[in-house]
Amino acid sequence: MAYDEKLIAALKSKAKTLRRDTIEMIKAGGAGWLGGSFSQADIITALMFHHLKHDPGNPKWEERDRLIVSKAHCCETVYAALGEAGYFDKKEYRSYGKFGAVLQAHTERIVPGIEYSGGSLGQGLSFALGEAMAARIGRPTPLYRVFCILGDGECNEGQVWEAVMAAAHYKVDNLVAIIDHNKFQSGSKVEDRINLIPMVEKWQTFGWNAVEIDGHNYTEILTALENADKTPGQPHAIVAHTVKCKGVPAFEHKNLHFCKLTDDMYAEAMAVLG
């Protein structure tokens, strides 16, 4: 599917802004989840600034689409997107991760625009499934859609697959799971812990409409999201192949999970993103 070049350029520019603001947040907070935040930045951008139905002026609008970030530690790009969209003042970035601040190191629902208070991995898809089923109660068509971003490492958790089975059984077709498949988790490559390959076929076998894409290619991201709306009767999985730390070439493909930014790292990142 072809998209307007101006739209793609605008989304790329927005993603660069989110990555830059993420660097500023992590620098202000002393440390943060750099790699996983950067790998999901293009997905977050496509959702927040093109695909989702939401209203920053009315964060609790009943018909809004829900974005559940199960990998809730990678909250920095989510906060950056919400601030950029106007859910809160960007000055909140400066207090990220500090005691008593609104923006903490995992997503919390006290933050305008955040739908899910995260922490332990593997739980977000179950929460998203409940939200998606609630949207269908007493209605011929769902009131809203639910999008859940998972890390590939957290797919080691059995609870994820319980939710996968339940969603397929109940044909919850207003639920879209997006797997940020950057191939790393805390401490190792994902394949060295529990090998999840073939990822797409697993979701398909469990009864999902599953596809795989380049998670940094906006045409592929937007096409997959739009196609999910056109395929009734099944929940949808998008396995997005991504690069950890995408956006700063010197950091890419490195397992910079939770890290402190040195002055040199900050300068290197801002030379690309600033």
Which sequence ranges carry the predicted segments?
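Cofactor-binding active-site loop characterized by glycine-rich and histidine/acidic residues
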Residues: 22-25, 37-169
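Glycine/aspartate-rich loop-and-adjacent alpha/beta segment that forms the canonical ThDP
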Residues: 218-274
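Glycine-rich beta-alpha junction loops
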Residues: 73-74, 78, 182-183, 217, ...
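N-terminal capping segment at the start of a domain
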Residues: 14-31, 180-182
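Generic beta-sheet signal
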Residues: 65-67, 144-148, 175, 234-242
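Short acidic, glycine/serine/threonine-rich loops at helix termini
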Residues: 79-81, 108, 159-161, 187-191, ...
